[in-house]
């Protein structure tokens, strides 16, 4: 933070006010109002037709799947779904918008008044972030600026033009860059879970605009700085950095000129990644500047209650519910549940299958976090390609819980199974490891206690740590014995004496 910003913070209490507009490309096979494919990566201007090029006389035909995916998203975001929505023309000129207007939604969006819960910084409590609306519109084309050649060429690719875009607008409820990232992470998780979008930011299927201003407490009076919209942020890291920079810039700006929201217009700024700062673009247009009016080529869309209910029934268990269930049903830590859920449905299924075989949620969670995910990262593979089936991992973990293998021997078996498609029994034989029989372990412990009466007396006197000396002896006599199992059995046997 700059010296001026630090000084301003010291003089006045400052609250950061953040609202996010998230633009999500929906995962449909064709565009919103024509039959052109939405596949990413095709040569420029090869996925176009008279409709998306805005040719005279070409009429749009609505994509029903885009409506269904929008309703599905709205329901998952706790939005109200109105019985009627309509299409409006948002009129502005830009080279990558060939019609001269964008088909969007103005006063009757397809989703309204929702909320999304996010975890706070402590990871234990939740905060509810309000949603103003989510409206469906067609995406614009893409301008590609070639400044490296020295001639500042700009080329237009209209392949993206007309792709279904759901704009999700939050209330200004976020209070820090970290909260903004947490909101975006939770939203992305939900969207990918629902399979409504792939949310690949590097491909432009998820883009973020951040609205930022400050509330400064001056002698008990709240002063609001002018709102700035930071456009087209293409990574969560850039969202954080842009917000943090903008907070500092607005503090310094207010210290210098005392401009407030009442005497300065809303402006848009871009983010310069290399310079790590925002830069001025233009004054922000108001809705009247776009001259919205109902699109005469498209009928309003009716959304019967039965239609909405059928989509609601197909939602299944959402990530927030799964996260809570994993904690209560399997007894795992909130952080572990969060990581597992964030990996997606396939990892959740793998974990729960392994727990079914192991009978120990906490121990299985530990193996997932430390061993399974580490291996996936090292090998750059998904859980579908993981070489150890979930049931087999669960069986291995159960052997630890039952005292038949200690952690070190179990990890030897785990590493072996990564490269050998064998059962647990075959793997232990291949490694020369023998699972310890319960009767054999009990005989060994009785033998040790008989040879060490002083340990028995010490434990009976309340010094349970005295059994530690016998655990080492047990490992020497039988290297396959689990220290945890030996310790517990020794204490149990002494209690019966």
UniProtKB/Swiss-Prot annotation:
The keyword ATP-binding applies. Keywords: ATP-binding, Ligase, Nucleotide-binding, Protein biosynthesis. Its EC number is 6.3.5.-. InterPro entries: Asn/Gln-tRNA_amidoTrfase_suB/E, Asn/Gln-tRNA_Trfase_suB/E_cat, Asn/Gln_amidotransferase, Asn/Gln_tRNA_amidoTrase-B-like, GatB, GatB_Yqey_C_2, Gln-tRNA_amidoTrfase_suB_CS, Gln_synth/guanido_kin_cat_dom. One of its GO terms (biological process) is translation. It is an enzyme of class 6 (ligase). It catalyses: L-glutamyl-tRNA(Gln) + L-glutamine + ATP + H2O = L-glutaminyl-tRNA(Gln) + L-glutamate + ADP + phosphate + H(+); L-aspartyl-tRNA(Asn) + L-glutamine + ATP + H2O = L-asparaginyl-tRNA(Asn) + L-glutamate + ADP + phosphate + 2 H(+). It holds the Pfam family GatB_N. The keyword Ligase applies. One of its GO terms (molecular function) is glutaminyl-tRNA synthase (glutamine-hydrolyzing) activity. SUPFAM superfamilies: GatB/YqeY motif, Glutamine synthetase/guanido kinase. Gene3D superfamilies: 1.10.10.410. Belongs to the GatB/GatE family. GatB subfamily. Heterotrimer of A, B and C subunits. Allows the formation of correctly charged Asn-tRNA(Asn) or Gln-tRNA(Gln) through the transamidation of misacylated Asp-tRNA(Asn) or Glu-tRNA(Gln) in organisms which lack either or both of asparaginyl-tRNA or glutaminyl-tRNA synthetases. The reaction takes place in the presence of glutamine and ATP through an activated phospho-Asp-tRNA(Asn) or phospho-Glu-tRNA(Gln). This is Aspartyl/glutamyl-tRNA(Asn/Gln) amidotransferase subunit B. It comes from Rhodopirellula baltica (strain DSM 10527 / NCIMB 13988 / SH1). The gene is gatB.
């Amino acid at each position: 933070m700059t010296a001026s910003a630090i000084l301003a913070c010291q003089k006045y209490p400052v609250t950061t006010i953040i609202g996010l507009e998230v633009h999500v490309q929906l995962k449909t096979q064709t565009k919103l109002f024509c039959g052109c494919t939405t596949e990413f990566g095709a040569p420029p201007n090869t996925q176009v037709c008279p409709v998306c090029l805005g040719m005279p006389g070409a009429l749009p035909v609505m994509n029903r799947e885009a409506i269904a995916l929008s309703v599905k998203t709205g329901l998952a975001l706790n939005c109200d779904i109105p019985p009627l929505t309509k299409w409006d023309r948002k009129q502005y000129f830009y080279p990558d918008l060939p019609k001269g207007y964008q088909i969007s939604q103005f006063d009757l969006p397809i989703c309204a008044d929702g909320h999304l819960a996010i975890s706070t910084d402590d990871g234990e409590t939740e905060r509810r972030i309000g949603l103003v609306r989510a409206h469906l519109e067609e995406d614009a084309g893409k301008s590609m600026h070639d400044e490296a050649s020295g001639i500042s060429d700009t080329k237009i690719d209209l392949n993206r033009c007309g792709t279904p875009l759901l704009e999700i607008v939050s209330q200004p409820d976020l209070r820090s860059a970290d909260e903004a990232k947490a909101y975006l992470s939770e939203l992305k998780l939900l969207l990918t879970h629902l399979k409504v979008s792939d949310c690949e930011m590097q491909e432009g299927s998820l883009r973020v605009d951040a609205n930022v201003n400050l509330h400064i407490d001056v002698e008990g009076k709240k002063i609001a700085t002018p709102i700035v919209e930071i456009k087209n942020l293409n990574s969560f890291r850039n969202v954080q950095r842009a917000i943090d920079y903008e907070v500092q810039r607005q503090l310094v700006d207010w210290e210098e000129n005392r401009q407030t929201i009442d005497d300065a217009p809303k402006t848009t700024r871009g983010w310069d990644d290399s310079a790590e700062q925002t830069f001025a673009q233009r004054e922000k247009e108001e809705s009247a500047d776009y001259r919205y009016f109902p699109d005469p080529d498209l009928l309003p869309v009716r959304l019967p209650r039965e239609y909405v209910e059928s989509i609601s029934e197909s939602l299944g268990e959402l990530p927030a519910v799964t996260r809570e269930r994993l904690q209560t049903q399997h007894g795992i830590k909130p952080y572990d549940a969060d990581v597992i859920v964030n990996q997606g449905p396939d990892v959740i299924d793998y974990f729960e299958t392994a727990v079914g075989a192991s009978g120990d949620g906490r121990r299985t969670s530990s193996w997932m976090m430390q061993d399974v995910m580490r291996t996936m990262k090292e090998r750059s593979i998904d859980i579908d390609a993981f070489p150890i089936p979930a049931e087999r991992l669960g069986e291995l973990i159960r052997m630890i819980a039952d005292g038949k293998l200690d952690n070190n021997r179990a990890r030897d078996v785990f590493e072996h199974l990564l490269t050998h498609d064998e059962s647990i029994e075959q793997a232990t034989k291949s490694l020369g490891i023998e699972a310890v029989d319960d009767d054999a372990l009990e005989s060994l412990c009785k033998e040790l206690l008989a040879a060490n009466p002083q340990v028995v007396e010490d434990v009976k006197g309340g010094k349970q740590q005295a059994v530690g000396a016998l655990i080492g002896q047990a490992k020497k006599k039988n290297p396959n014995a689990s220290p945890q199992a030996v310790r517990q059995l020794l204490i149990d046997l002494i209690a019966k004496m």
